[in-house]
Every structure is written in C-alpha cells, then in structure tokens.
Amino acid sequence: MKRAHRMPFGAELAGGGASFRLWAPACESVELLLARERSVPMHRTADGWHATELEDVVAGTAYSFRVDDGDAVPDPASRSNPWDPQGPSALVDPLAHEWRDGDWRGRPWNEAVVYELHVGTFTPEGTFAAAIGKLDHLARVGVTALEIMPVADFPGSRNWGYDGVLPYAPDASYGTPEDFKRLIEEAHRRGLMVLLDVVYNHFGPEGNQLHRYAPQFFTEAHQTPWGAAINFDGKHSGVVRDFFIHNALYWVIEFHLDGLRLDAVHAIHDDSPTHIVLDIARALADGPGRDRHVHLVLENERNDPALLDRRATHATAQWNDPWHHCAHVLCSGETSGYYGHFTRDTARLLAQSFAHGFSESLPAIAFMPFLQNHDQVGNRAMGERLALLAPPEALRLAQAALLLSPQVPLLFMGEEIGAKTPFLYFCDFHGDLAAAVREGRRKEFAAFPEFAAEEARSKIPDPNSADAFLASKIDWDNANAGCLARFLELLALRREHIVPRLDDTPRVAQFDAVAPGAVLVDWTLADGARLHLRANFSAEAAPIESAPGTILHAEGSSNGGLGPWSGTWTLEAAR
C-alpha cells in the first residue's frame, strides 16, 4: 500500500516531473535553483505565489529558492532537508514507500498506555532505525502508544525538537523520511500506535528564513515566550492556517501516524471565529479519522475543557499537569518554584485531579497523568528523574497509582526500567544565541535557593555542550529488573481489569482526603463496576478504612489503616 498527501505548498512529484510552489508575497521574483548552478524563473501570481513545473527532475534532486535579496532559501514545506535548515531541500517521492503494516486502523483511546520518547537519546545511536530495536521491549511491557518528541528539522545535530524551523522535514540527524516510516510501520506491526509531537506556536530562533520572503507568516498582535507569534488571525492568515492544517494532515496521512500531540496550545494565539486548533482537529476527524482511529492530544496550561469537547473539537486527551504537580510534592517533598502552588491541601488536589481532572463533564480517558515527562525532568537544572528525588516506597506507590486508574497513563522513556540518567536541556546553537541560551538558562534558576549563588549556577550544564546531550541517553545496560517486573505486572492488571471497563462517557467519581497525604477515590466504570483507590502518600500511618470489592493490588501495609506509602486498589462488581 502507498500513501501520499498532496498539498498546495512545496514540491510535488507527478507525471514524470515535479511542480514547485512557494508563497513569497514580499518578493517580486523568485528563482528555482537546482544542481550545477541551474536556475529557473518562477511565475508570480497576484496573491504572492511563485510557481513552476519541470519534467527532468527526480526524487533526491536538491533544490532551493533564490529570493529578492539574492540568497537561496530552503522550501518551508520541504519533505527532506539533508543539509540542515540552511542548506537546500531534497525532492521526496512519498509513493516510493510500500507500506507493510497491513490493514492497521489504530486502537481506541481507552487502550492507550503512552510512552514519550526523544529519538536522539532513546538509543545509543539516536536514530529512527535504532528505535525499532526497542519496540519488542515496549510491547512486552504493555505500552500501546509511542508519543515521539518533535522531529521537525532543527539547526545543528541535537535538540529537544521545539526549535524546529522546517515542520514537514524529519531532522536528518535521526535518519531519512523513509527511516521514520519504517519505524512507524514496525510499531504498528507490534500493535503500537505512534503519535508525533508537533509545534504550531512558534518557529525556532535559528535557521528560520520565512521572515525574508513571507513576513506575513508572523504577527505583532500577539506575543509568545519563544519568538514571533504566528499569524493565525490577521491579514493573509488564510495561507498560514492552510500551511499548518496541511502539516497535520501530512504527518497523519503520509506517515500513517495515529495522531498528534499539540505543544502548548495556550500559546497558539488566534482570535478568529474558529480557533486554528479546532480547524486542525476537524480536518483530522473529517479526513483520515473517518476510516481509522486518529487521536489528538493537547498540552494546555489553561486547562480549558471546551477544547476537549468530544463532539465540537474531536480532541482526545490532555496531559494532567495538576496530578503530576501534587504527586511530585507528596513524593519528593519539593516545594520550590511552581510546586509552591501545590503545597496546600495537596492530597485533596491530587484526589480531585484523579477523580475528574479539571472538569466533571469529561471522561476519565480525556486526562493523562504522569510522574515524569520531558518538561518536568528536563526543565530541572540538573535534569534529575523522580527516582533520585523520592524514597523508593513513595515511587512504587505513585507508579501503581499512575498505572491503575481509569485515566490514560503517560510514561517517559526509561521510566519502566528505573532509569536514573538525567534528561537535560540540550541544543546546538552557536555564537551570540548559544551564549544567550546558556546564560538565560542559568538566570532562570537564580530564584531557587539551591542556585542562589553564582558558583552553584555555574555548575548548571551548558545546553549547547554535546556532553549534555550524551548524558541524557538512556542507559539500557543498567536496567532495574525489579522495576521492569513491576511495570509488567501492573500493566497486565490494567489490561485485564480496567481497560475493558473504560469508554468515552463522563461518569461519576467521588474523592476525599482524610489525612495529610491520604486520598480516597472511587470511580464508576462503564459496566457499572466501581474501582476504589485508598492510598497514603506520606511517611506517617493514616486511619483509612478499607474499600469494598476484590483486591487487585496492594502496596505497603494495610492492616488497621494504611501504613506509610501504602495503598490498595479494589474492584467492586456492578450492583
């Protein structure tokens, strides 16, 4: 089977040749540049498009565009940019890939156990091809979905992915577009969904050429923390909106992805009658979503339940940040930074966010709790994982709570093997930008007591150093066998007793906190059964009465209440 998404942007191979289109409204003329200094004038239309067609080009041909200032720029819709964003693009024939994942239609969201990974640090090689070698391991653990951090082409050889500047081109440091497709189809053959993290709120600070020939892509009406805001609601925004809608469709159709994770939708500024996030969600639902499961996961600091309305927006789920913050405070005892907002009634807030997230009108599977992710680990000065910050018994209780709830658990790469390697912030900038990022990173932590002194801040790793990247690679040779066995056991329990009882309907859940750290949560499941959690997230015993039903799992001691860092999960049959 072959798959391709045709779009009005960039280069398209067809009929023995190729068409080239560039939206460059600021340019009077544009030339297509090919090998051996060949240039072809492009035809300009009144709406700022420049186009031409050629018959003597094939897949792999390098091309770029010469704009008014005389310099060459890559195709902003390039499917491949092997020579970094500053270099030329390469023609790709999407129909050259023969898909071998059969009649894969995805999986319903109630089956999701999501595993976030960064391609560059997931394996020693840091490539799409090498990641295939870990798929059997993930399937055996009980993972059912990969959530891959952004792969859009970025400057240099290492980056988290949120500084991408060519959103259609997988970064060449990970491999080719063909390599990425092989990773996805091999995941499908093992029953694993694949979601891709995409960034639609800004372009990276280095390597973005759009302002030179299409400044209309940006607006001064809005601001973002990371650079110029994208123009989704001003003059010429129609083309800009189409660019990102097609990008979403391109990834899901041409790469046969099972969905997307939209980064920081609170920073996607759009005052249009219909927000761009809704247009993207509807395009996915009305397109590839008609024939298979296509999921849309959001990151949204504003916790807006309207964006998760199943009928209006077609969005699937959102990361449950409040649950993480409360669990982290209870397990680690940390209260600095934003954790300071979660030091009062922490147990009650934890129970509430577990019972119904931030809205009782949404089903449990609309929320994704987590103990670790790239933000919560990587935005620490030293990138420490929770395994280094919490007592082992606290970590075990929190892991069981994460995996044995009706909400959809999100794991961070290496968590299942008890990885203790850091996940640091890293990039590959140079010159003034590199210095600004390094110093900005250190100033960011000046308000934390442990980094108040300049000497302490000087020890924060330089994000531009290759050492920060290399230190962040998972150490598979030192996997914790006991931790892995626990994840296998807990996810088997989830698969057998919880997943079959989950659906897309909001249901009643009760919660309470009866002592510091002691939480009670009772969920009503789709078949009328009730799942009861009684957990003590503290180092002191708590007088919690046992819940009715059959015990699915227990942590610590539960005789006459709950001992420190203890909990029980019971399943009560429908009445």
Language model: regions and residue ranges:
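The feature marks proteins involved in alpha-glucan
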Residues: 1-15, 19, 39-116, 121-126, ...
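Glycan-recognition and catalytic regions of carbohydrate-active enzymes
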Residues: 3, 411, 417-426, 451-531
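Conserved, mostly hydrophobic/aromatic
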Residues: 22, 65, 117, 138, ...
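Short proline/glycine-enriched turn/loop motifs at strand-loop junctions of beta-rich domains
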Residues: 23-29, 538-540, 547-548
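C-terminal beta-strand-rich structural cap/linker in extracellular carbohydrate-active enzymes
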Residues: 24, 59-63, 558-575
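Glycine-rich phosphate/pyrophosphate-binding loop
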Residues: 80-116, 329-373, 381, 444-489, ...
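Substrate-binding/active-site clefts of carbohydrate-active enzymes
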Residues: 82-83, 105-109, 118-289, 295, ...
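Conserved alpha/beta catalytic core and glycan-binding cleft of carbohydrate-active enzymes
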Residues: 83, 277, 281-453, 533
